[in-house]
Amino acid sequence: MAAVVQQNDLVFEFASNVMEDEQQLGDPAIFPAVIVEHVPGADILNSYAGLACVEEPNDMITESSLDVAEEEIIDEDEDDITLTVEASCHNGDETIETIEAAEALLNMDSPGPMLDEKRMNNSIFSSSEDDMVVAPVTHVSVTLDGIPEVMETQHVQETYAHSPGPSSPEQPKRKKGRKTKPPRPDSPTTTPNISVKKKNKDGKGNTIYLWEFLLALLQDKATCPKYIKWTQREKGIFKLVDSKAVSRLWGKHKNKPDMNYETMGRALRYYYQRGILAKVEGQRLVYQFKDMPKDLIYIDDEDPSCSIESSDPSLSSTATSSRNPASRSRASSSPGIKGGATTVLKPGNSKAAKPKDPMEPVQPSEALRTVQSTQAPYPTQLFRTIHVVQPVQAVPEAEAASSMPEETLNPSVPSIRTIQTPAQVPVVVSPGNQHLHTVTLQTVPITTVIASADPSSAAGSQKFILQAIPSSQPMTVLKENVVLQSQKPGSPPSIVLSPAHVQQVLTSSVPTVCNGTVSAASAPSFSATTPMVTFSHHSSQLVAHPPGTVITSVIKAQEAKTHIQEEVKKEVEDNEKQGTEDAEQQLQPYVMVVSNGFPSQAAIKNELLEPSSF
């Protein structure tokens, strides 16, 4: 364009040039073809370019003479980016075509390869780094010659350069090494303490060899002298008492369950060449250590603790627990009685009795018996009492057979146990855990306790209350002879216990008995220090003989005669007079005191007393 000084000439020159340019724009051979690609969706476009495009309708351009059209694109980061499209054409159709071409160029991919790679990583993988990259600012302009120009400015935050990208070099993989084996147990049986632990010559770990294993067994109470023992300790000679068990333990230690003595013997013969072991000539399963360590633990054969059984189930045998004869409580029942069964007392640690135990006779149901132990009781031992009473029916002596189950009572168990058997006698085992010296046993007819019970069925039933009285309470002598009388024909006479060196003691706080009931005013308060047991007889006949137990007093209450007579008359129909006398003598409530810790000398004599003697 030539420079003209006058302004009019300059304007004319510019207008002529514009006309020439319009003619050139009409020729399609001047410009290359523009390819417009349709994007599948607006969501993909937004995520691909990192921009939120606000589509405006074509009505925004109201005047065809406008030279500039502006379109706003709002970014996600609230940054306004203005794309300016400049058109020099005054014709409306040409302006629209130019704007469409500019929009097509705007939608096309950017020419920068680095920008394409970053856009691809951010849009396809939808990583969290999209928020860190600011979308580029694109300016599209059409020059006077009709050639559109695209100018794109890229702004990348500094944090993106420092952030690790997916193209970062991967960390080197770790080499897979050998898995470490778990440490083996020190001993095959319940991991005993092994005092001898030697390393091999190379100093690699604490592997236990067979000769060290045998030394460990010789120092273990669970295996010595049960499986292996010393024969000559000073010379280091030992014997495999149970070669199969030793080989089995060695196989368990080596994790070889099929180990036997032949395989283990080959390893022992290997030690002959090494000078560690030697075979004793002429003796089977006898070996000798050449060098003996000085810090060995020797176990004597006479030590009772050496016979502890191994915890290995393959080597376990029948367990035998030590039983204290003074702490045994025996009970006898008659297996021949109809409807009866043998009673076995089974606490937590009880063991079944052996059949070779001696058999003891049984007293009939109307007799009260206490058997004295031949051994002196221990100072801390307390009473264990089983009371047998059957006032109405007498069991023939021919049917009385005894079976003696044993039990070992643990003082840590609860202080009272009640065992019921299928027939008609109460059983109470009371292992005391307090230093008590006196027990009060009181009988109360069931008819006075349960008013709605049938008198004919409840006349022979009684309720027994066993109360332990501490020795610290004051004592009062009431009666010297203890009498339990039975006048029914065919029944044995009563047993009278006359202690020689024992004074009959009874606490002054014993509740008074009136018509078979306990008066609430004078009844003592039962607490944890004064245990009490209430039981009724519905089982077979049993007799107990705790060591050092003496019955010191039996007292009858005369107030209950009339009431009991009326109850028994309904039951006994064949002999009304005889049944009434039996009820007066047998069903009257009485109080019995059992004391322990006194000299166990008592004379038993048969004596018939009249009711007036009480």
UniProtKB/Swiss-Prot annotation:
What are the transmembrane regions?
A: none
Give the subcellular location.
Nucleus
Pfam families according to UniProt: Elf-1_N, Ets
Q: Which residues carry this modification: Phosphoserine?
A: S110, S163, S167, S168, S187, S430
Q: Which InterPro entries match?
A: Ets_dom (IPR000418), ETS_fam (IPR046328), TF_Elf_N (IPR022084), WH-like_DNA-bd_sf (IPR036388), WH_DNA-bd_sf (IPR036390)
Q: Which GO terms describe its biological process?
A: cell differentiation; negative regulation of T cell receptor signaling pathway; regulation of cytokine production; regulation of transcription by RNA polymerase II
Biased composition regions of type Low complexity, renumbered to the chain: 310-335
Q: Where is this region: Disordered?
A: 159-199, 303-371
Keywords attached to this entry:
Activator, DNA-binding, Nucleus, Phosphoprotein, Transcription, Transcription regulation
The reply to whether DNA-binding figures as a keyword in the UniProt entry is: yes
* Bias (Basic residues): 173-182
Top-rank lineage group of the source organism: Eukaryota
DNA-binding region, residues: 208-290
Q: List where this protein forms a coiled coil.
A: none
Which residues does the record list as Phosphothreonine (modified residue)?
T190
* Molecular-function GO term, any one: DNA-binding transcription activator activity, RNA polymerase II-specific
Q: How does it assemble?
A: Binds to the underphosphorylated form of RB. May interact with other transcription factors in order to regulate specific genes. Interacts with RUNX1.
By sequence similarity, the record places it as follows:
Belongs to the ETS family.
| General function of this protein | Transcription factor that activates the LYN and BLK promoters.
Q: Under what name is this protein listed?
A: ETS-related transcription factor Elf-1
Q: Which lineage ranks, top first, belong to the organism behind this chain?
A: Eukaryota, Metazoa, Chordata, Craniata, Vertebrata
